[in-house]
UniProtKB/Swiss-Prot annotation:
It catalyses: N(2)-acetyl-L-ornithine + L-glutamate = N-acetyl-L-glutamate + L-ornithine; L-glutamate + acetyl-CoA = N-acetyl-L-glutamate + CoA + H(+). Keywords: Acyltransferase, Amino-acid biosynthesis, Arginine biosynthesis, Autocatalytic cleavage, Cytoplasm, Multifunctional enzyme, Transferase. Catalyzes two activities which are involved in the cyclic version of arginine biosynthesis: the synthesis of N-acetylglutamate from glutamate and acetyl-CoA as the acetyl donor, and of ornithine by transacetylation between N(2)-acetylornithine and glutamate. This is Arginine biosynthesis bifunctional protein ArgJ. PANTHER family: ARGININE BIOSYNTHESIS BIFUNCTIONAL PROTEIN ARGJ (PTHR23100), ARGININE BIOSYNTHESIS BIFUNCTIONAL PROTEIN ARGJ, MITOCHONDRIAL (PTHR23100:SF0). It comes from Colwellia psychrerythraea (strain 34H / ATCC BAA-681). The active site is at T203. The keyword Cytoplasm applies. It is found in: Cytoplasm. Pfam families: ArgJ. Substrate binds at T166, K192, T203, E290, N419, T424. CDD domains: OAT. The record marks A202, T203 as: Cleavage.
Amino acid sequence: MPVNLPEIVPASLTPIQGIRLGWAESNIKTQNRKDLLVIEICDGSAVSGVFTQNRFCAAPVTLCKKHLDAVKNNATTGGNVSGIKALVVNTGNANAGTGEQGMLDALTTCQHLAEIMAIPVESILPFSTGVILEHLPMDKLLAGLPLAVTNLTTDNWADAASAIMTTDIAPKAYATQVKVGGESINITGISKGAGMIHPNMATMLGYVATDANITQSLLDSMTKEIADLSFNCISVDGDTSTNDSFIVIATGKSNAVAITSPNDKGYQEVFDALLETSQYLAKAIVRDGEGATKFITVTVKGALSIDEAKTIGFSIGKSPLVKTAMFASDPNLGRVLAAIGYASRECDSLADLDTNQLELYFGGLLVAEKGGRAASYKEDEGQAIMNEAEIDITVQLHRGNEESTIWTCDFSYDYVKINAEYRT
């Protein structure tokens, strides 16, 4: 079961003015389950996306980028595509590694939805998640589109969270609200993911919507920064997927003042609320990591750069030896120290890391310093911390002022079982 992940309360997921969501059971991979989602976006909205860095990216990712570029080019040249009007998401099939046919299938999906909704093809962003190297069952997917559009309502966020799940055990959603100049701004989001999770995006999908009025260029920069502080700070297994996507939508329907620059009133409040939502959704993916029994926070302080800190954090967080020790509730200091030591392979500036200066903490307990076990450390105290479902690991490098936090989970027997049986 997920590690301390609260169950979704549908009534708590605030509808976002200008957004409607609809789902269908298309039987793409599994019978009688939600597996197709359409999100309708009102005119005048700003939409921004961040996508996988995997060079083997899926066809829908390529088409998403193309359609976003078409919208941005239209804004400067004038044309018929005035903005993104809809998102369409299917689960059960990633449409990755499917060549020209995969691109044609992604485009055909957009064409059929465009006809149903009477909107331009280029105004639709397609997303797929599931098994790689299998072609989409287009007859099933296309048959589901009219049903999903018929189901469009403003309060479908909980069902939408369920409709994008694959190996997830639990749906993931979050909502919050801030006040700017006495006016409310709402933020609601959903995410999916449980395995093949590592930064630069992973096999995760995240969709966050707000009724704030944010210019397109500012939303683009905010989305990138928020992704770097949330979805790019998680790891379940160290694998980066072909399909990951993070989309932020600002409908502009709130009565609050427009936000056009980081210096504007309300910018920080809205940024913080978007970040809060995104970090919750990112951590929810880790809490629901395939077979996870522990949620682990790794904080690295005293680095020369954020890159140094994040590199060490992920070196610890994606180490199979560290993760299996966490599953066993084994306070194995050596495995953590070893992971710190080989982090220099990924970050050249760590080549001169003085291991005699660093300190390692489990929770608030000093467990290693001066190149070895702390003199005050007692194994039973470390064991007590490892027995907890949530574990904090802190590394103090004492070489600078930068820090970074990442979130990961343990490796259990079930992780192997889930992935060994994934295609069967």
